Swiss-Prot record:
It is found in: Cell membrane. The gene is nuoK. NDH-1 shuttles electrons from NADH, via FMN and iron-sulfur (Fe-S) centers, to quinones in the respiratory chain. The immediate electron acceptor for the enzyme in this species is believed to be ubiquinone. Couples the redox reaction to proton translocation (for every two electrons transferred, four hydrogen ions are translocated across the cytoplasmic membrane), and thus conserves the redox energy in a proton gradient. This is NADH-quinone oxidoreductase subunit K. It comes from Herpetosiphon aurantiacus (strain ATCC 23779 / DSM 785 / 114-95). The lineage of its organism: Bacteria, Bacillati, Chloroflexota, Chloroflexia, Herpetosiphonales. It is a multi-pass membrane protein.
Length: 100
């Protein structure tokens, strides 16, 4: 059986990869994927702690986090399509003004 520490370590590694992806990359699509990786790593930690304590609270919270993440992806992709149509790029450095 895999210990809770292994799950937490994996979650921390995935979260760190997500933070590095958001800070280093300039492509909006990669930044969205990195944010999703960070949310999923938090979900993994919640599930691990929920499993260790034999309670279902972490699983319930994870379900709501997944629902909010789905809404975030829908809004984010709509914004991305709008920005791409206006600027013809997905590079975040090229989109520095609010003017169309």
């Amino acid at each position: 059986m895999i210990s809770t520490n292994a799950y937490v370590l994996l979650s921390a590694i995935l979260f760190t990869i997500g933070v590095v992806g958001v800070l280093v990359r300039r492509n909006v699509i990669v930044m969205f994927m990195s944010v999703e990786l960070m949310l999923n790593s938090a979900n993994l930690a919640l599930i691990a702690f929920s499993r260790a304590r034999a309670e279902s609270d972490g699983q319930i919270i994870t379900f709501f986090v997944i629902a909010v993440a789905a809404a975030e992806v829908a809004v984010g992709l709509a914004l991305l399509v709008s920005i791409f149509r206006a600027k013809k790029t997905t590079n975040i450095d090229d989109v520095n003004t609010l003017k169309g």
